[in-house]
Every structure is written in structure tokens, then in C-alpha cells.
Amino acid sequence: FLIPALKSWKMGQKILDIGPRWHKSKEGTPTMGGLAFIAACLVTSTITVAFIVALDGPAGSSALILTLALALANGAVGVFDDLVKFSHKRNEGLRASQKYFLQLVVAGLYLFGMYMTGNITTELYIPFVGIFLDLGIFYFVVALLVITGIVNSVNLADGVDGLVSCETVVVGIFFAAVSF
């Protein structure tokens, strides 16, 4: 439903002339297909939060709500990037520095919210040794790099054809496993 709609609205990707010739055949591949992932994330997360609130009360849901907000805000950065590409009728949206700055702001707000709600501390558990290492303020620097690195991992793996669903499933399974 979404891909045909994007094609009819001519929301296709422009291809730069600097790459291999076969890339030109991918011109017109719909952009903003990430909206489907954002919608799926929103629906499943909302259902999950509703179950957790019903079972444990609202106290246990703040981390989930903040993490959902993190995902949606990063999705919004991607949508904004695609809108810039579309409005300028070129393949270049936000500059990398602009996009990374927005991702840092989003991650920083997430970490601030998690810290203020008591969902994280500055301690890092070292497995197999069984000790906690208090990183202090450095914890947030490391966490910012980890969050933005994870956010960009799928983006960098996305090819010319925009078929990022396989990578997204792998990353989603990882996050599901880590969250439990």
C-alpha cells in the first residue's frame, strides 16, 4: 500500500551521475519507505507498553516510552532527510554533520530522560569479572557514540535499491533479545 502510493506521488530517489551506470536503473526507487517501519514500531511498542502498564503499572513503562520516543525521533530525522532530498529534487538531503547533530540531540535527550527517571546509572557492569565500573560523565559520551552508531548502522547498510528490511529485521531481533 505505501510503496505504490509513494510511486504515484513521485517520491522517487534521484541517482547521482558519479556512481556506476547500473545505479541509474534504480532511479525512481521510492524514498520514505521507512514510514512503514516507523508505523510498525509505533503499533507494536504501543501494544507492548499497554500490556506492561496493565501488568506492572505505569512505573515500569518509562524506559519503554523513552525508547519508543528515541526510535520515533530518529525516524523523524530520516523522514526530514528524505523530505529535503525530495524538495530539492536531488539525491543529497541533510549533510552528514547536520544529520549526526540531530541524532546526537535526540540521543542526548533520551539519555537525560533515562537518567532522570532512574532507568540508567553511570555504572558499567563488566561480565565474567563481576565488577561495576563507574564511568561518571564519560558514560554518557560512550552511550552517545553507541546509540548514534547503532542508529547509523542500518542507514549505512542500506543500498541503492532501498531494501533495508533484512538489516532492520536483524537489528530488531538484536534489540528484542537485548531488551529482555
Could you say what each language-model-derived stretch is?
Residues 1-180:
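"…together with the soluble PPM/PP2C metallo-phosphatase catalytic core" -> "…together
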